[in-house]
């Protein structure tokens, strides 16, 4: 083999495949589509959920429930986690929780629950508090500031309608 033989047979642009040009071409008669069947016909397109004529999976599986478009997404956090994550005298908000990677995602409201021990004096701003959480916060010398809801249910419905 010589250096000038290296690129022999390799072309930059491969010639297009000429189908249906007789048996000698290798793609004559059926033009590479095989014999009969839906895929051999012109205008064929397979639906993404077509399963060969069998009952499709989405029809076999039972359906349950629904997704409530107007439901609030509430992030719940226990006072024990707040005790571990925050220092004495700090203010706890949904933004502060997100900054400390405790609340990941978008939430409408923050709810504080009473599991765990709270020994630090914290100012907690949340939309909802459980009774035990309020008791533990006040026992530790902190304050529980109740925030007004971000949006009323009617405002949420209007916002969703305006998105369309």
From Swiss-Prot:
The keyword Cell cycle does not apply. The keyword Protease does not apply. One of its GO terms (biological process) is translation. Gene3D superfamilies: 3.100.10.10. Residues 1-57, 132-164 are annotated as: Disordered. Transmembrane segments: none annotated. Keywords: Ribonucleoprotein, Ribosomal protein, RNA-binding, rRNA-binding. GO terms for molecular function: rRNA binding; structural constituent of ribosome. Binds to the 23S rRNA. Belongs to the universal ribosomal protein uL15 family. Part of the 50S ribosomal subunit. This is Large ribosomal subunit protein uL15. The gene is rplO.
